[in-house]
């Protein structure tokens, strides 16, 4: 119990307290609190500390035989006692993060309606489009500072999950709190239910969402606009994170709102920021600079192109021209290398397409220029996979890359693990342990020739909690590109491999609080420099970060009335 903070004054008592997850303490209510709040007999006699509760909960957690059951168990604790939930996760962050988020959350999304137990967050359905403000008013959280919102159309690599996508905002906000210290009282997960095009869901009698094909076009755009306006009117200072929107909507929504409201898209910008931060760390470990790299991408969707644009921006900041930087980045998708004469390039792909004149001197390539063709002709030093298709980083491709690059940087980032382009074990064996590897999903350490290699997880959780904390602490009105670039550089500064020459490429999850605070300071400092918030000194910003950092400790309660 944190006795250094002032007590909270509660206007209600009895069973209602035990049903409020933000204030419930369960068996940790003191004798005085049990008397004053009419709780005697409603909980067992013994008065326990939060650590004793967490120990019991951990034993129960370990008793489950599969990850989905563990996920459901943790969600049940979260829905009954949030402070205990976050203490449990904090104590076991490396073990539990894959359970509360990727990869287990994907299965939880697929089975959302079948496993539904208790409400959390808000479902805003298209038939209720004229009552959005009323729905926002129904939220159990009224001091909302961070919203994660999805429409469920592109959940991880699993496609359209309808309202089952709610598992993603819930899981993401759990990481905002457990990694970034954002009080759960300030977070709100939202799912925009605009129908589903998943026939299995439409035919499933247990599906709980709006049984209707997805809306699109002007109807969809007007619904998103109504939602954004309603949120801004009710909570004008709230940070909105867009999550798992389909490629056709993700970039247009971001472009439409990023300069109007405080918002960002984690799939595009967060993924890009953590990838660039990891690349900066890998380059430092390899004794080189990012602007010297030749980079090949497999996957040219919004996430891949977002990473590529962030890399180009960082290269330019290191002293080369935008035009030169773009010649060093090759994007390969299902149709082969993106070229400027292709007729069906998406708007966000056009600036990343290679000029046909740049490949005139290439040799031995097919009509649709493959990744292997790119590797053989450009001799890349960096290979990034965001294709969502397993096994595409073949032994031939990796060995060809290693033949011209002593320490290749290889990031198979697709989620979940079943969709990774190549496993770290294969990559390290094919390169005799010389590759610098980071993945999008968690992998066990790999042993090559008696040496153990820890696999860095290029996980957005290293970035977005720090961005959120920095925005809240600084009061930034927008999330600028410069703030995102600052988050990448701050992450690279925390790399054990870059700092000491040994250890993993990215910090351990056990150090995530320090990493998030470091990123928050970098993000907040840029917000101040860009005039996106009120002027403040570095000292005041640091104090604000510490003051906004919530810890899972019980507070003392006092009763306001009888």
Swiss-Prot record:
Family recorded in the similarity comment: Belongs to the malic enzymes family.
Catalyses which reaction(s): (S)-malate + NAD(+) = pyruvate + CO2 + NADH; oxaloacetate + H(+) = pyruvate + CO2
Active-site residues from the entry: 101, 172
GO MF assignments: malate dehydrogenase (decarboxylating) (NAD+) activity; metal ion binding; NAD binding; oxaloacetate decarboxylase activity
Domain of life: Bacteria
UniProt name for this protein: NAD-dependent malic enzyme
Pfam families: malic, Malic_M
């Amino acid at each position: 119990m944190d006795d250094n903070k002032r007590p909270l004054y509660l206007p209600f008592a009895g069973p209602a307290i035990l049903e409020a997850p933000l204030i419930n303490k369960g068996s940790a209510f003191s004798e005085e609190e049990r008397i004053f709040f009419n709780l005697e007999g409603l909980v067992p006699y013994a008065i326990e500390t939060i650590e004793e509760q967490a120990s019991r909960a951990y034993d129960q957690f370990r008793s489950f035989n599969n990850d989905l059951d563990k996920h459901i168990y943790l969600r049940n604790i979260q829905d009954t006692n949030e402070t205990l939930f976050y203490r449990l996760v904090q104590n076991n962050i490396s073990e539990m993060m894959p359970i509360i988020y990727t990869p287990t959350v994907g299965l939880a999304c697929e089975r959302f309606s079948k496993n539904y137990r208790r409400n959390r967050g808000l479902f805003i359905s298209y038939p209720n489009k004229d009552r959005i403000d009323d729905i926002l008013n129904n939220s159990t959280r009224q001091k909302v500072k961070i919203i994660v919102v999805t429409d469920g159309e592109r959940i991880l690599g699993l496609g359209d999950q309808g309202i089952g996508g709610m598992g993603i905002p819930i899981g993401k906000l759990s990481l905002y709190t457990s990694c970034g210290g954002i009080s759960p009282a300030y977070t709100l997960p939202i799912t925009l239910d605009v129908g589903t095009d998943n026939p299995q869901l439409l035919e499933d009698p247990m599906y709980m969402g709006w049984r209707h094909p997805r809306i699109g076009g002007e109807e969809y755009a007007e619904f998103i606009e109504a939602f954004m306006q309603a949120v801004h009117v009710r909570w004008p200072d709230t940070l909105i994170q867009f999550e798992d929107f389909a490629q056709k909507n993700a970039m247009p929504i971001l472009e439409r709102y990023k300069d109007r409201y405080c918002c960002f898209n984690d799939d595009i910008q967060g993924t890009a920021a953590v990838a660039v931060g990891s690349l900066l760390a890998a380059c430092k470990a390899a004794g080189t600079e990012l602007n010297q790299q030749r980079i090949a991408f497999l996957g040219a969707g919004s996430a891949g192109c977002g990473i590529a644009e962030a890399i180009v921006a960082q290269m330019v900041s290191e002293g080369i021209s935008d035009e030169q930087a773009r010649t060093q980045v090759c994007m390969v998708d299902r149709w082969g290398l993106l070229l400027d004469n292709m007729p069906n390039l998406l708007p966000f792909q056009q600036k990343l397409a290679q000029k046909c004149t740049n490949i005139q001197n290439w040799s031995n390539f097919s009509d649709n220029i493959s990744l292997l063709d790119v590797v053989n002709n450009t001799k890349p030093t960096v290979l990034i996979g965001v294709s969502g298709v397993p096994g595409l980083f073949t032994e031939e491709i990796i060995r060809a890359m290693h033949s011209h690059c002593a320490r290749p940087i290889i990031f198979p980032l697709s989620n979940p693990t079943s969709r990774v382009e190549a496993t770290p074990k294969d990559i390290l064996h094919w390169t005799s342990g010389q590759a610098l590897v980071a993945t999008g999903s968690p992998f066990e350490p790999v042993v090559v020739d008696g040496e153990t290699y820890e696999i860095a997880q290029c996980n957005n959780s290293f970035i977005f909690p720090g961005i959120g904390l920095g925005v809240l602490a600084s009061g930034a009105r927008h999330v600028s590109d410069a703030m995102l670039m600052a988050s990448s550089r701050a992450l690279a500064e925390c790399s054990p491999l870059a700092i000491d020459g040994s250890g993993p490429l990215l910090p351990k999850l056990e150090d995530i609080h320090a990493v998030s605070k470091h990123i928050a300071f970098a993000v907040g400092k840029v917000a101040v420099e860009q005039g996106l918030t009120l002027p403040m000194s570095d000292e005041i910003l640091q104090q604000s970060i510490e003051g906004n950092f919530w810890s899972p400790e019980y507070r003392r309660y006092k009763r306001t009335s009888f």
